[in-house]
Curated annotation (Swiss-Prot):
Record's protein name: Curved DNA-binding protein
Keyword Cytoplasm appears in the UniProt entry: yes
InterPro entries the record matches: DNA-bd_curved-DNA, DnaJ_C, DnaJ_domain, DnaJ_domain_CS, HSP40/DnaJ_pept-bd, J_dom_sf
Lineage summary: Bacteria, Pseudomonadati, Pseudomonadota, Gammaproteobacteria, Enterobacterales
Source species: Shigella dysenteriae serotype 1 (strain Sd197)
Name of the encoding gene: cbpA
Any single biological process term in GO: protein refolding
UniProt GO cellular component terms: cytoplasm; nucleoid
Localization annotation: Cytoplasm, Nucleoid
Length: 306
């Protein structure tokens, strides 16, 4: 397997801080999101970026990855993990590979009683739109085979067709019984756990079962009221902006949030007032007329008061 350069994938340097890496991740997630991007292989790029973020966003896993990267040319690393098939290292292999190289205790060579196989965890990226209904997914992972000393001797690729239920949430674990590593001496197999990762969406933020979307409006739309088209996970809707709306005001759209077995969340449109470009002479005169008509209005009247 080939150890991927996660820093290069994210377009950052190994010395960059988490804030810089997060900024790069959000930019790339927006760029390659399949619902938005028209670039070829957008989904593959998106998943690769999500995989890099999974490791680099975690302080411990990032430190372990950095150590692995430093040792990538060591003979021990090459013998165990650089196979001729050109298969790439990914985040699903991370914990097994690191512990195998840097600290897993050798197993005792004497005969052991029947023992249950190890569980395996892999992360499955799910788009927000996919959480609305049950969908099928083909997943691939590697079953590690250990030698008598507890070292990974080889990895056997395995593919499964699974169903991801509707309403899955971020961090939810789905158990696939018996799909982990084989047991020892007649013991039962371990399980495979699918850990759901809800991929970031370029428009929606998740707040519990609800969704938030920032809706840009003009000053006159906020002042006079308007109807604007707003996307949801299923379709676009016509949202009514009431007269006198304020920046940051949250408008609730019932039943347009996330779906679960117990409830359906809501969508909250957060208004963002966007000013037009620098006004020309005529436009400036109109703004001045408005200012004169509202001369008694002081937006800072209650500023700083409890």
């Amino acid at each position: 397997m080939e150890l991927k350069d996660y820093y290069a994938i994210m377009g950052v340097k190994p010395t960059d801080d988490l804030k810089t890496i997060k900024t790069a991740y959000r930019r790339l997630a927006r760029k390659y999101h399949p619902d938005v991007s028209k670039e070829p292989d957008a989904e593959a790029h998106f998943k690769e970026v999500a995989e890099a973020w999974e490791v680099l966003s975690d302080e411990q896993r990032r430190a372990e990855y950095d150590q692995m990267w430093q040792h990538r040319n060591d003979p021990q690393f090459n013998r165990q993990f650089h196979h001729s098939d050109g298969q790439s290292f990914n985040a699903e292999d991370f914990d097994d590979i690191f512990s195998s190289i840097f600290g897993q205790h050798a197993r005792q060579s004497r005969q052991r009683p029947a023992a249950r196989g190890h569980d395996i965890e892999i992360e499955v990226a799910v788009f927000l739109e996919e959480t609305l209904t049950e969908h099928k997914r083909t997943i691939s992972y590697n079953l590690p085979v250990y030698n008598a000393f507890g070292m990974i001797e080889q990895e056997i690729p395995k593919t499964l067709n699974v169903k991801i239920p509707a309403g899955v949430g971020n961090g939810q674990r789905i158990r696939l019984k018996g799909q982990g590593t084989p047991g020892e001496n007649g013991g039962p197999n371990g399980d495979l756990w699918l850990v759901i990762h809800i991929a970031p969406h370029p428009l929606f933020d998740i707040v519990g079962q609800d969704l938030e979307i920032v809706v840009p409006v003009s000053p006159w739309e906020a002042a006079l009221g308007a109807k604007v088209t707003v996307p949801t996970l299923k379709e676009s809707i016509l949202l009514t902006i009431p007269p006198g709306s304020q920046a940051g005001q949250r408008l609730r759209v019932k039943g347009k949030g996330l779906v679960s077995k117990k409830q359906t969340g809501d969508l909250y449109a957060v208004l963002k007032i966007v000013m037009p470009p620098k006004p020309d002479e005529n436009t400036a005169a109109l703004w001045q007329q408005l200012a004169d008509a509202q001369s008694s209005f002081d937006p800072r009247k209650d500023w700083g008061k409890a």
